[in-house]
Curated annotation (Swiss-Prot):
Residues engaged in binding ATP: 616-623
Alphabetic keyword roster: ATP-binding, DNA damage, DNA repair, DNA-binding, Nucleotide-binding
Gene Ontology BP terms: mismatch repair
Protein name: DNA mismatch repair protein MutS
GO cellular component term of the entry, any: cytosol
Superkingdom of origin: Bacteria
Protein task: This protein is involved in the repair of mismatches in DNA. It is possible that it carries out the mismatch recognition step. This protein has a weak ATPase activity.
HAMAP family found in the cross-reference section: MutS
One term of GO molecular function: ATP binding
Keyword Transcription regulation tagged: no
GTP-binding keyword on record: no
Amino acid sequence: MNENIDKDFSSHTPMMQQYLKLKAQHPEILLFYRMGDFYELFYDDAKRASQLLDISLTKRGASAGEPIPMAGIPYHAVENYLAKLVNQGESVAICEQIGDPATSKGPVERKVVRIVTPGTISDEALLQERQDNLLAAIWQDSKGFGYATLDISSGRFRLSEPADRETMAAELQRTNPAELLYAEDFAEMSLIEGRRGLRRRPLWEFEIDTARQQLNLQFGTRDLVGFGVENAPRGLCAAGCLLQYAKDTQRTTLPHIRSITMEREQDSIIMDAATRRNLEITQNLAGGAENTLASVLDCTVTPMGSRMLKRWLHMPVRDTRVLLERQQTIGALQDFTAELQPVLRQVGDLERILARLALRTARPRDLARMRHAFQQLPELRAQLETVDSAPVQALREKMGEFAELRDLLERAIIDTPPVLVRDGGVIASGYNEELDEWRALADGATDYLERLEVRERERTGLDTLKVGFNAVHGYYIQISRGQSHLAPINYMRRQTLKNAERYIIPELKEYEDKVLTSKGKALALEKQLYEELFDLLLPHLEALQQSASALAELDVLVNLAERAYTLNYTCPTFIDKPGIRITEGRHPVVEQVLNEPFIANPLNLSPQRRMLIITGPNMGGKSTYMRQTALIALMAYIGSYVPAQKVEIGPIDRIFTRVGAADDLASGRSTFMVEMTETANILHNATEYSLVLMDEIGRGTSTYDGLSLAWACAENLANKIKALTLFATHYFELTQLPEKMEGVANVHLDALEHGDTIAFMHSVQDGAASKSYGLAVAALAGVPKEVIKRARQKLRELESISPNAAATQVDGTQMSLLSVPEEISPAVEALENLDPDSLTPRQALEWIYRLKSLV
């Protein structure tokens, strides 16, 4: 708002005084001020809106002697404009006319009826269908952080108490809130800077006693012991602020928020922000959703199922009872997916419809969709009855039937209702006798008008006479200009057109009053009956929410059963001791995008074999092999089947990845600094139950520094921490580690080279790689031939300095990036290195195809 606007408002017109008083209550956000068929914005709001929405900036008269900048949007298109603003992180106060213009003296009474913010939206048009939309609050004191999240579109309310900065950063990455509330004295601003939807809140909103009082009031409880959050003061501070903000913005009760859950670190596998990013769980490194784990696993048929699956993927559980139950359910459902999925698809997004019901913002089509969901329940229950699985039967019971509510909605709502109740025509005929009577009066107009037109034509003999209606002038009798001089004396002129005259007669005027009254009465009664439907449905809200949750879970499990069958996944076995044994493991995403068969590989990690030093050429598949191990572990710990022939997996508490790096220029951190920060986090927090992926540690600095750091890190992980570690490196010295300490083994990925060409085998073999094939990879990448030629010359010089260079490495510190070309056929070389006795029939067949391609 302009600073020069008069603060006492007295110099402004009455309408602008009303606007300015309302705007003063919401200074930080845009105010949509309803005027007739438009929402208007004034002053700085108008200037901002015109830029954000690309709409015209005009002026509206003057107030206090100054022209008023103005922008406006039609009320019927408001959802589209709100969606644009919310996507840009803006919040909007919606101000409606609540008084009657006919009876108002001065400006019509108006008030703000709701505030739309990025984290508190529930409207279907504003939400991403298959993603959670979270409001979050963060609090910090000397003991750590408090963090709370609320999905207002489902009522899911969670809190946690991250102990340190890294854990807090991981939580922010996992939950990715649309809006984040923070205290005005929040110390760790660098943690949240740059995030969307940041909202600074006063300190008193985070007060612990107020928080307890707010939460008890919301849940109708005397204390919070039953929710297991009583001893989480930091989390409660965040939750209290969050709940108050939700109430302030919605301007109504929130009956669908009926509990709060504590999320504890020990309940799930912890993944830091870097790990979530590197594993590309729901978002790829470019920020998109293609070629992610979710893109392969998510063939759910309901939006609420899709959102639940993504929550599972970001919070793998450690409770093997839960996991075994999910595995059993997936196994039991495999023969039923084709029958269940088409019916589940018809259920739709019941979860979000129920939230809108609770907020009393559900539209007629929401109730029609709810009715359609209820109509699927009998068939779903009948199909599930034959499934021999206790967890499936438990879900079937939770689903309920709701025959009474289905019957109510079938009687009350027409088959295909309009978008808004204000347009009428929502309540079905036969539901309410009085409504039917008023409608009959209003609908009888057509017959009456046709009869009147025939009668008057016959009486007057005027063939151009017709009876009509428009919204401005009401009912009329129209006669062409050529015959208007013959109009009877009792015809009173109502409107003159270019080619016709319009008249009214007392009988038509009387009927008009009657029809318009009956239409108004019918519409008012219809709105009342619609509100009463909410009162009839809301007592069942808790059972309905349980049903939606059960249907979403069923969708996820049926989806995982279908994926397991279609993609040839196997059920993993959980074992008590740390370790991972994989037979013919595959990368779930890479195998889907390859145009050729994926080369499956084994893996064996155990207390006796805790670390694998992985060597081999760039592009040879080291990173794929490492990531597929982490993804198989993650999939196993959501209860899913996995891409392998056989998997045995022990307890895992954390998954760490130090894979690739880019400069974090915004924070002033180089590639090497980023790498070392992530490495420090691993060395401080990994345990013997952690799975650690380390790729090319130390390459961001000088050779000797890098090698020393890589050696020390590997030694620490293997000897002290004893974590299950995959350690990929180009430092050939590290392949000596197995000789110097127990529990370490070498594996390598092979390649065949001929001149400037190279064939990657992508198969993991025991032992260290003999060379790095850097020259061939460089040629493959399109490095100019003269550069490759000069590199060969330089390599010969280096070899002459170090006679054993070919057998060892340049300067004895780093695997050779360049290799002397050998004029041996790659097929011959392949055969020389081949041990035929070690091949399975399938591998032998694969080798024949490879050799054929090398000739």
